[in-house]
Amino acid sequence: MYVNKKNMRRAIILFSILFADFILLLLNCFEQLEQVLIFTGGYAIGTLVLTECLLYKTTSKINFFLLFVGISFTFEFGQSMSVFLGGYNNMNPIWFLNINSGFFNGKEIWEAFFFMHMLMMSFAASYIIFYKDNLQINEERNSIITVVSQKKLKKECQIGYFLLLVSIIPTFYMLKKDIMTIQIYGYGATLQATSGGIEKIFTLLSEFFPISVIWLLIYEKRKQRKLMILLLTFAYMFLQLVGGSRIQVFRFAVILFLMYSLYYKKINKRNMIFLFLAGGIGVFVLSLISSIRTMIYTSSNLSELIQKAAVDLWENNFIVETLRELGNTQIINTLVYKECPKVIDYAYGTSYLKMVFSIVPNLWGGVHPSSIDVDSIFSPLYSKTTGLGSSFVAEAYWNFGFLSIIVCFILGKIFTYIDIGLNEVCKLGVKDNKLKAYIFFYLCFLLIFWVRSSCNGFGRSVLFAAVPIIMNKITIK
């Protein structure tokens, strides 16, 4: 296997950081909570910038993995980062979703941070080692342009519109339900809500919404139709924010960016500045909606709430506030590291096998085997009222303990195949292989969820994603 020497030197830098993580984990330099959060926050920001620079040097583009690592750091270490940037006083210890609520001491947060950081470094180093630009490998393929008949393209678009029609009402109904739950009972109620009957069917049908959007953005050539799909997607993203789901917004934002920067090449260096400004506004809106959600019980006057929330965010640094809220995944990471295997035994890989179980419908009633994940096992140790979610690093540690460093190294290699595949379908001429493009973009959409969740439901999601492919094979011959 050929390994680029420059890539190996970059990977060695990350392995050096991994070794430094191990030394710092053993040393326990600080015990006071404030000092721990400030140090780990500065460390996370510094290593994030360095890692992203090394990844960009490796790939020469802003690709899926670079975005995945950036989002991962924001979620996995966000609360430490918010303390470093905004000060310890910005973390209210009364709020149970803040890591300084009193459940963990400084030593526990310190050790969990540096071990999870080791996993991130192993993950990124592996990617850099195995990544290769497939420009020369696919040179012959790029010269082949497939002629797609208009009749075939029309049928492929019809598949996407059919799935969109099937899913649009269930999707927006469930979003409306979440928003109404927040207005009446508060945000925490959406985290505890369960569905049954028609709502369970609606939840399943809503799986087709992102699938149909990705499919149509690839197959639909008419600009007005594509604009309609984009407006529908932006409406969905906005309502997801109001309903409390930030990770769904990140998933669509990443996919839209990848499609329009790599696949359609509509985003270049000149309009990248505008994109960053739009991103900053988006972060402010995210924080604003989050603040309104938490303050909604204090007033029924919406304009008054928006004004008060906007002023508070501007005065208290909305970026710090966003990091604090997104970074509560750091709590589940710390909890898993603290309680496993002392209270909860290792899963020994069974967590990953549950992806297969999620394909089988729950015909026998009760708890579905695939629903037993990091969140359901560990969250009750911290809070009896709400779930804490999960992350791919927490899941790796729960399964294999210290061997999860090797697991994350393997995951890094797997992610290289996704980006190499994306490179291939995004090259001129190969764009005609739309089915392959759909598969890779959907995989990206699916994997982003792993930043904030376990992979136990991935099997079912892949099964749903296969539906338009099967329909395509049946209807088009």
Regions found by a protein language model. Give the residues of each.
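Membrane-embedded catalytic interface detector for glycan/lipid assembly enzymes
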Residues: E34-V36, W95-F103, Y131-N268, G279-T298
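Small-residue-enriched transmembrane helix-hairpin modules in multi-pass membrane proteins
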Residues: Y187-S195, V283-L411
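Hydrophobic alpha-helical segments
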Residues: T385-K477
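Hydrophobic alpha-helical transmembrane segments
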Residues: F104-A124, G196-I211, F318-T329
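Hydrophobic, aromatic-rich transmembrane alpha-helices
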Residues: G46-E52, F209-K221, V407-E424
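Hydrophobic, membrane-inserted alpha-helices
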Residues: F19-L24, G46-L48, F208-I214, L231-L239, ...
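Membrane-interfacial loop-to-transmembrane alpha-helix junctions, especially the N-terminal start
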Residues: K5-F15, T59-S72, C157-G160, K223-L230, ...
